[in-house]
Amino acid sequence: MQNQRIRIRLKAFDHKLIDASTQEIVETAKRTGAQVRGPIPLPTRKERFTVLISPHVNKDARDQYEIRTHKRLLDIVEPTEKTVDALMKLDLAAGVEVQISLG
């Protein structure tokens, strides 16, 4: 796996969950002898929704909701075979989306 790079993108609604998962990946990669760059926090996407409270009248009565999508980026430089095996066996928390690309 010479001159390889593994890029890992993580997405989650809960920032504590994504930070814990990122820390677990970093510890696993370092334990197997790989060099890690990151975690790099990417911009948080904020989606806002405005909903009318009443079914008929009172246009002024509204509720506002927000969903925040937190993102992190990790680069594992020069991974070993042990690193790839350990990352495949790693069990992350539910609610964290993981995208892995080889470059």
From Swiss-Prot:
Q: Which InterPro entries does the record match to this protein?
A: Ribosomal_uS10, Ribosomal_uS10_CS, Ribosomal_uS10_dom, Ribosomal_uS10_dom_sf
Is Ribonucleoprotein one of the keywords? yes
Against Gene3D superfamilies, the record matches this protein to: Ribosomal protein S10 domain
Q: GO molecular-function annotation terms? A: structural constituent of ribosome; tRNA binding
Q: Which UniProt keywords apply?
A: Ribonucleoprotein, Ribosomal protein
**Which example biological process does GO assign this protein?**
translation
Q: In terms of domain of life, where is this protein from?
A: Bacteria
**GO-annotated cellular components:** ribonucleoprotein complex; ribosome
Query: Do the record's keywords include Ribonucleoprotein?
Result: yes
> Subunit arrangement?
Part of the 30S ribosomal subunit.
Family note: Belongs to the universal ribosomal protein uS10 family.
Q: So what does this one do? A: Involved in the binding of tRNA to the ribosomes.
Name assigned to this protein: Small ribosomal subunit protein uS10
Organism (species): Cellvibrio japonicus (strain Ueda107) (Pseudomonas fluorescens subsp. cellulosa)
